[in-house]
Swiss-Prot record:
This is Probable tRNA pseudouridine synthase D. Keywords: Isomerase, tRNA processing. Residues 141-340 form the TRUD domain. The keyword tRNA processing applies. Belongs to the pseudouridine synthase TruD family. Coiled coil: none annotated. Could be responsible for synthesis of pseudouridine from uracil-13 in transfer RNAs. Pfam families: TruD. It catalyses: uridine(13) in tRNA = pseudouridine(13) in tRNA. It comes from Nanoarchaeum equitans (strain Kin4-M).
């Protein structure tokens, strides 16, 4: 099964209930996203961002540069797929009341608000996905796994770094951050190999710094800090806090996935799919919540037994989670594809709605019961 052969094959439209004031001429064009015109005017300028073949983070950097303002004045509700055409709401603190039209990015000014668009404030996403596969033979309900992008882009290691950070095993976390090789450029791989070779030689590590490509900006910040401080833990302070939290959230996601897999393993009619990750799918929906581990969440029954087993195996304690201020939360164990429509042409056009936090790629696997050819 193939998806995302080109950006037009994967369309994502954010659903929101955000309220604006003083709607612009573009407001009617985007009312279908759920935007309301009963808001209060204020210091936040609201836009619809349409992007193609760009991550949300890349798009924000371009907007900041074009408008000559700090990217930290820009906020959005959630990161959208890169190899796709996506629509989402963004806000800029005291941003210009104008639109922007570039090759892969269109920004439509739609109004004002007294509040910003906040992370996680959208309701869900509509999807239109072209699937190159034989035929749908699966289910419109699915175990609510985190998909591969949660664990990294070209290296599926974010959860491993997060695990070692929680355990305060800073050297181990640093080794994975700096030396683990993924599907990267030859230059990047060479730099990682040099760092591994020079691991215990500060003077030689200094010579690697000028060789590090732009793609390794996080690694470069860490290595420079380590050379200066000579302390694996203190050097992590050179990395933005939100990135460190991303590693820890990735580990929470890993434990969630493993819990859900173990929970499903003994059930009936389980279908196993393996591509970059391993998934178990089932033909039923169950209304359960599974913790994203933290010191303030409590599991019960079979779920508790599984999580206790996994954390013991991983060497993670509640005290460690408390020390890293990992509070935890809950996530639905199963999800549904709402308003599902499927049409056959040369490929399968699937249209559906998912609540926020669920992955369309996981839903598609469940529907077609095939691994995705990345």
């Amino acid at each position: 099964m193939r998806i995302k052969e080109k950006p037009e094959d994967f369309v994502v439209i954010e659903k929101t209930n955000f309220s604006i004031a003083e709607p612009s001429k573009y407001y009617d064009q985007f009312k279908f996203m759920g935007i309301k015109d009963n808001g209060i005017p204020g210091d936040y300028t609201i836009y619809v961002l349409k992007k193609k073949n760009l991550s949300t983070t890349q798009a924000i950097k371009i907007i900041a540069k074009q408008f000559r303002l700090s990217k930290y004045r820009i906020s959005f509700s959630g990161e959208k797929d890169k190899k796709a055409i996506t629509y989402q709401l963004i806000s800029i603190y005291k941003g210009p009341k104008k639109s922007m039209f570039l090759d892969n990015l269109e920004l439509y000014y739609i109004g004002l608000s007294d509040k910003p668009v906040k992370l996680g404030s959208h309701l869900g996403n509509y999807f239109e996905i072209k699937v190159y596969a034989e035929s749908p033979k699966g289910f419109d309900v699915f175990p609510n796994y985190f998909d591969v992008q949660r664990f990294g882009d070209k290296r599926l290691v974010n959860h491993l770094i997060g695990k070692h950070l929680i355990k305060n095993e800073c050297e181990e976390a640093a080794k994975i951050l700096l030396t683990f090789v993924g599907k990267e450029s030859k230059k990047t791989i060479k730099v990682r190999q040099l760092i591994k070779e020079y691991w215990n030689n500060i003077e030689k590590l200094k010579k690697v710094i000028p060789l590090m490509p732009k793609a390794l900006d996080i690694e470069k910040a860490y290595l420079q800090s380590f050379i200066e401080k000579k302390d694996y833990c203190k050097a992590f302070k050179a990395i933005p806090k939100w990135i460190l939290m991303l590693f820890i959230h990735s580990y929470q996601s890993y434990i969630f996935n493993e819990t859900l897999k173990m929970y499903l393993k003994n059930k009936t009619k389980i279908i196993k799919i393996r591509d970059l990750l391993e998934f178990y799918f089932a033909d039923y929906y169950e209304n359960i919540e599974i913790p994203l581990i933290g010191y303030k969440v409590n599991a019960k029954g079979e779920i508790k037994e599984i999580i206790d087993y996994l954390l013991d195996k991983e060497g993670i304690t509640i005290e460690m989670l408390k020390n890293k201020k990992v509070v935890g939360t809950y996530r639905k164990g199963f999800q549904k594809m709402y308003d599902l429509k499927i049409k056959k042409n040369q490929k399968w056009l699937t249209k559906f709605y998912l609540e926020k936090g669920s992955y369309a790629t996981v839903a598609i696997r469940s529907l077609f019961l095939e691994p995705i050819d990345f």
